Amino acid sequence: MNQIQKVSKKIILAYCIPQFAVGLFTAMISNYLLYFYQPSKESGIPTLVTQGVVVLGILTFIGFVKAVGHVIDAVTDPLVANLSDKSRNKKGRRIPFMKYAAIPFGLSALLIFCAPQGRPGLVNNIWVALFIWAYFIFYTLYMIPHNALLPEMITDTKERVNVYTFNSLFFVTGSALGYVTPALVGMFKNAGLDVLLAWRATFAIFTVVGIILLLLPAVMIKEREYVNSVRPTVSLMQSLKHAFSNKHFRWVTLGQLLEGTAMSFFQSCIMYYVTSLMGLPETASVAILAISIVGSLCLYPLISKWGKKSGKRKPIIWGCVVFTIAEFIICFGADMPGPAMVKACGLAIFVSFPFAVLNILPGSMMADVIQYDTLTTGINQEGIFSAARSFITKLGTSLAIMIVPSLTVIGAAAGENIGRMGLKITALVGGLFCLGAVIAFIMYREEEVLALIHKKGEGANAGAEKKKVTK
C-alpha cells in the first residue's frame, strides 16, 4: 500500500480550478443555448433550427435534443463510474479519464453554437443535436471521475466544506464570466462583427480558457500519492442497487433532483425573464446577474461557517425555501407597478442567498453520505455513488429541459417564439419543484451520518496516537 501524502493547498487549488471552466460551459449551455436557438425578436439572432412544437406535437426541437442529451448523460454516468472505480491504470482511477476528456469536452461546447448554415434545415438540426450529445458524453467522462476524487483525497468533513467552498467559488466566478456574454457580444457587434460571429467569438474565448483549466489537474495531481483505494468487485447493477439501498442517499438524491430541476428552470429562462417579462435590454442581465453573484460571494464565509457548525441540512432547506419564494415572485409579481430595473435588482439580491447555499453545500452533503457508506462497507465506490446521483438528477433535468421550451411558447403572439404567460408558468413550476426539495431534505437524517463519521474519525485518530506511543 502506498504512503499517502497530505493534500497541500496547491493540490486543492489544482483540483478546484476546473470548476471555473465548468461554470463557463454551464453558463453557455444553460443560459444561452435556448436563447440562441429559440431567439426572441429582441435578440436579433436569426433562426437557425426548426422552430415550434415539432416533436410529438408538444416538444420543441431544442427542448427534445437537449433532453435526449441529458438522458444520454445520465445513462453513461454509471458506465463511466464503473469503469473509473475498477480502473487499474498506473496513474490512478480518476485523473486519466479527466486528461483525455478535457479537450473534446471544451470543443463540443463551442461547436454547439457553430451550426454551418445560416437558415433552419436538416443539416443544422443534425449538427446541433450531435454536438449537444457529444458535450454531455464528454462532460460525464470528465466530471464523474473528478467528483469521485474529492471524497477519496479529503476525508475530514469540515475540511471538505472548505474544499467545496473553493469549488463553488471557481464555479461561480466562471459562471460570472459566462454571464457577461451579452456585454462581450455587444462589444464585438460594435467592432463590426455580425450577431452570429459576435456570439461565436465570445464562446471561442471561453473555450480556450476552459480547456486550459480542465487540463491543470491532469498535469499537477499525482493521484497515487494521495489516494489508497479498494476497488469494488461487484457488477455495475449490484453497485447501483447497493447505492439506492442507502436511505440517506435516496433522500439526498431526491432533494438534489428537485432543487436542481428548479434551478434548471430558472437558468434556462433568466434571459427571457429580463428581456421579455421585465422589458429590459439584454445588457441589463449582466448587471442583474453580477448583483446576485457578488451577493452570493459575500455570503460564502457565513454559509461555510454555518455548514461546519450546524451541518449542511438546515442551510440547504432555508436556501430552497428562499428560492421557492423567488420563483413565486417572478410568477405573480412580474406585473407589479414600479421601475423594472429596481424590481430586477431587488430579486437579484434576494436570490443571492440560495445561490450561495446551493452552490456550496449539496456536494459536501453528498460526500458525507458517500463517506458514510465507505466506512460501513470498507469499499470505495465513490464513482458509482456520484454516478447514481447524477443519473437520477439528470433524468429530472431532462424532463425540465423538455418542459421549459414547450411552456415558454404559451401565449406567444403570432410569429413570435416566447409568451409572457408561458414564462410565468415556468417560474411557478420551478418554485413547486424547489418546494418538493424542501420536503426531501427534511426527511434526510444528517445527524446519523455525521455521528458515524465522527466516531470512526476519532477511532482512527486514537489508533494513530497509540502507534506513535508504542514506537
Feature locations, PLM:
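Membrane-embedded alpha-helical bundles of multi-pass transporters/translocases
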Residues: N2-K471
